[in-house]
Amino acid sequence: MSLRIIIADDHPVVRIGTRAVIESSGVGRVVGEADSAQALMALLGSQPCDLLVTDYSMPGSPQADGFAMIGMIRRRFPDLPVLMLSVSNNLAILRMVLDSGVLGLVDKSSSMDELPQAIQAVYRGQPYISRSLRERVEAAGSWRMREGDGKPLSPR
């Protein structure tokens, strides 16, 4: 079975590249594209899909983007697996994105090979963080251990 995937990003080149990687890898087929949070919510309401690959920030959208958009998706489509593409270097925001119900997070500078792996993991319900983001998170964690009181934060 080929996964039905919706792509959302405000940059046409990113959508074109994401579609090309998804379809050439054989991991799924793109059944719809959106360039804003508003278009995404309308598309999700009308087009069945198995997984969403979305940008975090789509400025200029009449509806909210970022956390507000994720919240709307989680409320209206609670079982939809979400993989987020991001250029953010803010580890606090990235952690909050994952805490909000996004299962996968891929840095837009990641290798093209990583996207199909991330899609497969997220569809199976497994969390996925791209290598480059994982390395940054680990580096920040080890820095905090050296600079802090030596006690890691407890899980929530």
Where are these regions (language model features)?
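Acidic, metal-coordinating helix/loop segments flanking the phosphotransfer/catalytic sites
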Residues: 33-51
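Short amphipathic alpha-helix used as the core "switch/output" element in two-component signaling
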Residues: 63-79, 95
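Two-component signal transduction core modules
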Residues: 52, 82, 105-106
